[in-house]
Amino acid sequence: MPTSDQLARRTFLGRTLAFGAGAVAVSRLDAAPADAAKLPYLQDRGWLVGCWTRPWAKFDYRVGMDAMAEAGFRYIALTGAKTKTRRVIAPATTLEESEQVGEEARKRGLTITNVYGGGVPLHEGGESLRKMIDNCAAAGAWSVLLAHVGNEETFRECCKTIAEGCDYAAEKRVVIVLKPHGGTTGTGPQLRRAAELIDRANFTVMYDPGNIYFYSDGQIDPVDDCPAVDGLITGMSVKDYQPPKNVALTPGTGQVDFPKLMARLRQGGFTHGPLAIECLAPGDPAHTLAEAKKARRFVEELVGG
């Protein structure tokens, strides 16, 4: 007799296959207005291999920018750094500070594709999200990244806040991006549910295979999960995973089958966009730099770059 875990997994796979079978017909990429494709984040520039600031989060953000430039990256995504908010850009960051972040990136030949400012309190309304959008625009960044859409009680309200935020962001040529992070948006089917409620051309999904494993305690393989978001994915946070709960890995050294995953993502319509390396094997700055170079080569080879 199957265990409860096996039954839960069968239910998940059944839902995933059902979503995947009809995904092309309801693809937000297919349905998006032509002007949405002109937004910087959604333009077809090929594969944009980049890196998050997370491996350098205990340093000033300029240290991370220097290292990423030295490692050969031209595209970066902003998250943790040694600031009063613990983020490079957060809702509490001023416009002037955000402008300075953008200038520091451009001085190093770096383009900012994504900005994660921490947990934006969507259930409290749209003020913090609008501040993030303003700050991203000031920095010349292409998108605001969100990692949650509230709990089951606030889910619909939070989706409404994001939809209204998308309307505001469109005026500033900014895209709002959601990636899986457990809770109500921890799997592909949950991400699709959010996307269907938000229903905006400048809303999109950044896939995160490491988080699919992490928040399912290793029970859900991202290769099985990703068909549920066919047509929605325009970027990937390149993160690996090792059980029981480790994502502090250089991509290609863990459990994620990246070649198989990329083949399935491409089948689902993900053919260009940011590929931002989020985590590296920890170590001193010299070690981190070496791992960043190794990870860049791995991702470039993965997509034939």
PLM feature spans:
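Short, acidic/polar
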Residues: K58-M68, E124-N135, Q219-C226
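C-terminal segment of N-terminal export signals and the immediately downstream linker at the start
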Residues: S27-G50, R54-K58, D66-A67
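N-terminal secretory signal peptides and thylakoid transit peptides that target proteins
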Residues: P2-G20
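Acidic/histidine-rich catalytic cores of soluble enzymes
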Residues: G46, M65, C166-A263, Q267-G268
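Hydrophobic faces of well-ordered beta-strands that scaffold small-molecule active sites
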Residues: W47-T53, I76-L78, I112-G117, V144-L146, ...
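Catalytic domains of carbohydrate-active enzymes, especially glycoside hydrolases
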Residues: G64-A81, A139-G140
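Glycine-rich, proline-tolerant flexible connector loops at the mouths of alpha/beta enzymes
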Residues: A77-Q100
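Active-site acidic/histidine proton-transfer and metal-coordination neighborhood
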Residues: T16-V26, V63, E104-T111, G117-Y207, ...
